Amino acid sequence: MVELDFNKTGGLIPAIAQDHETGEVLMLAYMNEAAWNKTLESGMATYFSRSRQSLWKKGETSGHVQVVKEIRIDCDNDTVLLKVEQKGGAACHLGYKSCFFRRVVKGDDPVIMEQQIFDPKKVYK
């Protein structure tokens, strides 16, 4: 079994979620050891919420869960890449497919590059 280095990074490691078919980066979150183990056990992406200080099963409220299709780890065993099937079409809590829906050109204000899939005000009441 792979041993991830949670100690090097203060107990949390970066976890990148990528669409398993297109390769599009959907989001960056963090995992502690409990989130890592839950992800391995369930096959569903589970992260550690830094704001709530608790485990967070992606999509638990919105229904936009991430089914893990493949897991890769980096050369230092301190970053995880999850190749996922994004259910419901949106990974971002603001209702977009990707959390990286804004583009910056030459330091100007960000430009929204995607259409919103859902209204977060209706989903997160």
UniProtKB/Swiss-Prot annotation:
Subunit structure: Homodimer.
A GO cellular component entry from the record: cytoplasm
Enzyme class: hydrolase
Listed Pfam families: PRA-CH (PF01502)
Places the protein is found: Cytoplasm
A GO BP entry: L-histidine biosynthetic process
GO molecular function: magnesium ion binding; phosphoribosyl-AMP cyclohydrolase activity; zinc ion binding
Reactions this protein catalyses: 1-(5-phospho-beta-D-ribosyl)-5'-AMP + H2O = 1-(5-phospho-beta-D-ribosyl)-5-[(5-phospho-beta-D-ribosylamino)methylideneamino]imidazole-4-carboxamide
UniProt family annotation: Belongs to the PRA-CH family.
Binding of Zn(2+), residues: C75, C92, C99
Protein name per UniProt: Phosphoribosyl-AMP cyclohydrolase
Enzyme Commission identifier(s): 3.5.4.19
Protein's pathway: Amino-acid biosynthesis; L-histidine biosynthesis; L-histidine from 5-phospho-alpha-D-ribose 1-diphosphate: step 3/9
Cofactors (names): Mg(2+); Zn(2+)
Cofactor binding description: Binds 1 Mg(2+) ion per subunit.
InterPro entries on file: PRA-CH (IPR026660), PRib_AMP_CycHydrolase_dom (IPR002496), PRib_AMP_CycHydrolase_sf (IPR038019)
Disulphide connectivity of cysteines: none
Positions of Mg(2+) binding: D74, D76, D78
Keywords: Amino-acid biosynthesis, Cytoplasm, Histidine biosynthesis, Hydrolase, Magnesium, Metal-binding, Zinc
Main location: cytoplasm
Biological function: Catalyzes the hydrolysis of the adenine ring of phosphoribosyl-AMP.
